[in-house]
């Protein structure tokens, strides 16, 4: 069971996504991700921020950010069953008014009708190689700015993003997962 770790909805249980295409971020990794974002050298301000959750799955990362004070979240997920779970989780937690859910392939984004993101969570399926294409698409569509912090979860053995317009800020390992943080170059 996935629970909210902190903030105004701390302890609330999220509906999990049973789709075989969805792999939830572990609680330990999710906690580390938010500790790194809001502490240390990244020093992100979640309060009032605009977050984008790419490959959103159950929406746990975006919902966690909303619980911790983010002002708005956009969830991008192509699996219809996962989209239903995201919608249900946002409604149960009273976040529906603060969210938009796009049922689309994150790598096929061609236009962006929202503000530039403050924080982007990118949790593509492990070993898929989809993180960089999705971030490139969102960047070309106008969703990433110079101050946007991008948090990417990959399998520990996968290489860091390379060949794109992104600069690595920090990288940490948690079990089989790697969390890497980037900004535009």
Model-derived regions: residue spans:
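Class I S-adenosyl-L-methionine-dependent methyltransferase catalytic core
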Residues: 1-185
């Amino acid at each position: 069971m996935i629970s909210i770790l902190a903030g105004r909805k701390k302890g609330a249980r999220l509906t999990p996504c049973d789709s075989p295409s969805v792999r939830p971020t572990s609680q330990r990794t999710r906690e580390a991700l938010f500790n790194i974002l809001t502490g240390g050298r990244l020093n992100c301000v979640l309060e009032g921020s605009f977050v984008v959750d790419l490959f959103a799955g159950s929406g746990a990362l975006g919902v966690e950010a909303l619980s911790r004070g983010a002002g708005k979240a956009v969830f991008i997920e192509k699996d219809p069953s996962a989209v239903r779970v995201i919608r249900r989780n946002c409604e149960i937690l009273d976040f529906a008014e603060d969210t938009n859910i796009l049922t689309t392939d994150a790598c096929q984004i061609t236009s962006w009708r929202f503000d530039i993101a403050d924080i982007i969570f990118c949790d593509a399926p492990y070993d898929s190689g989809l993180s960089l294409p999705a971030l490139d698409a969102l960047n070309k569509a106008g969703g990433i700015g110079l101050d946007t912090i991008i948090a990417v979860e990959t399998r520990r053995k996968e290489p860091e993003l390379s060949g794109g317009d992104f600069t690595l800020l920090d990288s940490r390992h948690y079990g089989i997962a790697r969390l890497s943080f980037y900004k535009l170059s």
